[in-house]
Amino acid sequence: MNTNTMPLEAETRVLIDRSLENLGWKLSGKEQNVYYEQPRSEAEKKKLGGKRPDYVLYSKDSDKPLIVIEAKKKGVRLDAALEQGIQYAKAIEAPLVFATDGVFCKAFHTVANRPPILNGEEVDEFIREALALRYLTSYEVNTVSPKVQYDRK
């Protein structure tokens, strides 16, 4: 399909798919850990009561949802999309939520009830599975030494 004729939210989904693939997420095949418009299990579908998150991402080593992503067309305010994603994530107990229009991205940690922090800054882009797993124990992750962070400021 020509991207010039796609609905705007579909364009956002193409960008999301590319980003997730580049980060090592599996969109299809035997190792698939990205699910479109539904979670993986019937129990999670039931918890959502017919609602359909745009994406649900899982760790390759777990059946528990790790991330919910809400996709919106360019120019739509992400606050409402993030809130929608938070509701879905809390229903299926996913700790991380992302909302994006393909240009901007907002993230939220449902357990800490605040944005996740990476190296002292709010997360504003999709992350690899290995990094997402580190957010299971804390809303704040450091991948560089505190000295480097301090020197950067």
Regions found by a protein language model. Name each.
Residues 1-66, 72-153:
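ATP-dependent helicase/translocase motor core
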